[in-house]
Amino acid sequence: MGMRPTARMPKLTRRSRILILIALGVIALLLAGPRLIDAYVDWLWFGELGYRSVFSTVLVTRFVVFLIAGLLVGGIVFAGLAVAYRTRPVFVPSNDNDPVARYRALVLSRLRLVSIGVPVAIGLLAGIIAQSYWVRIQLFLHGGDFGIKDPQFGKDLGFYAFELPFYRLLLSYLFVAVFLAFVANLLAHYIFGGIRLSGRTGALSRSARIQLVTLVGLLVLLKAVAYWLDRYELLSHTRGGKPFTGAGYTDINAVLPAKLILMAIALICAAAVFSAITMRDLRIPAIGLVLLLLSSLIVGAGWPLIVEQISVKPNAAQKESEYISRSITATRQAYGLTSDVVTYRNYTGDAQATAQQVADDRATTSNIRLLDPTIVSPAFTQFQQGKNFYYFPDQLSIDRYLDRNGALRDYVVAARELNPDRLIDNQRDWINRHTVYTHGNGFIASPANTVRGIANDPNQNGGYPEFLVNVVGANGNVVSDGPAPLDQPRVYFGPVISNTSADYAIVGRNGADREYDYETSTETKNYTYTGLGGVPIGDWLSRSVFAAKFAERNFLFSNVIGSNSKILFNRDPARRVEAVAPWLTTDSSVYPAIVNKRLVWIIDGYTTLDNYPYSELTSLESATADSNEVAFNKLAPDKRVSYIRNSVKATVDAYDGTVTLYQQDEQDPVLKAWMQVFPGTVKPKSDISPELAEHLRYPEDLFKVQRMLLAKYHVNDPVTFFSTSDFWDVPLDPNPTASSYQPPYYIVAKNIAKNDNSSSYQLTSAMNRFKRDYLAAYISASSDPATYGRITVLTIPGQVNGPKLANNAITTDPAVSQDLGVIGRDNQNRIRWGNLLTLPVGQGGLLYVEPVYASPGASDAASSYPRLIRVAMMYNDKIGYGPTVRDALTGLFGPGAGAAATNIQPTEGGAPAASPPANAPAPAVTPGSAPPVAAPPVPDGSVTLSPAKAAVLQEIQAAIGAAKDAQKKGDFAGYGAALQRLDDAITKYNNTK
């Protein structure tokens, strides 16, 4: 029976077609409109920053890749369909029960839609996916050599970093395109009758056979190419159960030959498949494909498994030693841990020290950090917030400056930003929120080695930071009492002010000043932003675009927006850097610094790879997670890398948002490639001013990755490495409230890199022995301009207490626990332990220092800011304890040891009501003794007391006597009871008339 006439589809009316077109237009506008608006806004924003070339380069690259990939994949699929249609049988037998006939009629009635629409849809999807790989393509086009060859194939590492990923991408797209063309060709031949399944055997036309066989042969050829490329990827492969990365004995001696054998078999199979073009018998290509499948199972999987089990496992350490050595060398190269960077020195760790030796370590003892930046933020808020809408982050930053005597000191620093979430009531009105409350005001720095007065009780007026302030004062002038002069303390850009969904401020003169700035005793003073940053929104087009961008009609109707108005948005410093340098991974820590009288945010940027041969693959999220990151939710991105360089230092001006990128690593091939992709965007290292260099610090995230790798890759001997017996561990944070690794600490101490007593700003970490709590090493990374980036590892033999053991010894010492029990008053006051610092002192000793904070009440209320109340130390097995560093050092080493330590003076003015006096500091407390009792203040001159006050004064004297007696006897319970009597008596005295 002949083919039935083609069934006609019902025609749409003109009105229906118009309605459908309108509906499709609305849908397209809804889908594309927001993207077009975002693209236009980004174009404006990048232009305002001076990085429009970055935006245009990325956009053009994505578009070109989209076109090429779409045309390639769509074109191949179209060719498969077109050839199948053109070679279809002229006459196709059919009957009324043939289900294919209905599909054939449908396709023929919409032939243009199917033949063009399907390839276009597939091409669009392929292009959309491909454009996301623009980074890989740009690196292929601009990548260079590393100058290092891999140990197996002798290829420069630039091949693995820049070329191999592109070849893999191209191969994947060709494979997908040919496979889809095969599917399309198969379906087309089936629908048009080239393939018929009726009867027992069915029928296959000659044209269908030739086309399908050709496509299958191409797939097999592509598989042969894949086997060839697989050889190179073995060098970044990790076989399960091995303690190293890269091709091992089994991979080199079994898997690598297997890949070559499989490639040869694939070529033979491809020839067998192509033979079916001229031969009608399809059994030969079928046998070839089955052979390829069986070979991949036997040769590709079975043979390596046999070699692994029989040859390698019984002698694994010896068999793998050569390849372990390769991994050690490559990992050190990839993570910047080579011998020209890392220096190892032996250090006893438990040497005895005299008071004079400790006193001579002035660079260390004079800079012992008492302020924990994760604890003192409430004190900054309490004393320096000023207004409800100003805010300090929960975790402050550490930087260094020269003090007034020219000595290097570390400071806890913070910018006083505006927090939009703290605005209340009418302050949240759109006009107030975005045109009045636009900026923060001030830079606050506190010397980290001292506090303002001694507090013997959390209710006393002492123990809080000394504040050095750069701020706009009540007369409108800049008060510059900070560690460095600052011309402009207003903060329009920062991580706090940007932490909101509506991150924008509208600035610029439109009549009178509108922006809240400061207050005098009689009035509020406003300000108008004068910086260069900001996108103009004075015209109606810009106002309309931003109204759509932020879904806010006030852009159109508010009269506060004038011809001179500008909008500041995308104000997070790290996000700004990531936008203008999309190839960078930024450090999770951003810190403010005064550089050349300007307040800037400093951000560390990393270039990374994930396929460095033989280098260990590391998760940034897990490697950088420590107790601070977990507590403050600042985890690094979940990104796996096998190569990392701190290649860029970036600054963002806190006033006008200017982003500047500086080349930090002049040897990094990845950075060199990106500097060719985006010429002129990264300034050379020589442009880093000396003032900026003084505030660059070794980045935390990089250091945490490196210390985790040094735990393994400090081992030189491959057999020892395989046994893991000499590995180290990153210590857990000993604080009982912590749940992760101990963070590294920035400190100013004696110069470990130069091995002398000069002051050095460094990032440090202790390292434990593998699965034990004893110290194995001490790591210091220098941030000094002259020795920046040099890592010194002090290796410690013997059983020296690690952080956990030191913390346990300090917190369980009888004198310490008894004294803190009295201060805590049965949990009425909260005791918090600060960061446990590990400091090399003397001639081979290690000093542990742990500040103790207390706050009134058992909660974390903002008003209950913590005060430094004690300093605890441990040296070898001895505990030092007291209200000051000097007292604790004296208790440990004897008189004179703390001569260089900061001398904290007693708080002036006595104690507030219901508190023991603050003007009588307790001396150091040695283990096994309790602190002496502080006497109440004695009025100056002749004073006549009322009978009631005189009686209470006798109670005070009796309580003091009881406390002294208990102290002499070592009766801690009696001592605590006497102190409580004393506290009650003082309260009664102050309330008695």
From Swiss-Prot:
Keywords: Cell membrane, Membrane, Transmembrane, Transmembrane helix. The chain crosses the membrane at residues 18-38, 63-83, 113-133, 175-195, 210-230, 254-274, 287-307. It is a multi-pass membrane protein. InterPro entries: UPF0182 (IPR005372). One of its GO terms (cellular component) is plasma membrane. It is found in: Cell membrane. It comes from the Bacteria. Residues 929-939 have a biased composition (Pro residues). Its main location: membrane. Residues 903-941 are annotated as: Disordered. Pfam families: UPF0182. Belongs to the UPF0182 family. PANTHER family: UPF0182 PROTEIN SLL1060. This is UPF0182 protein MAV_4137.
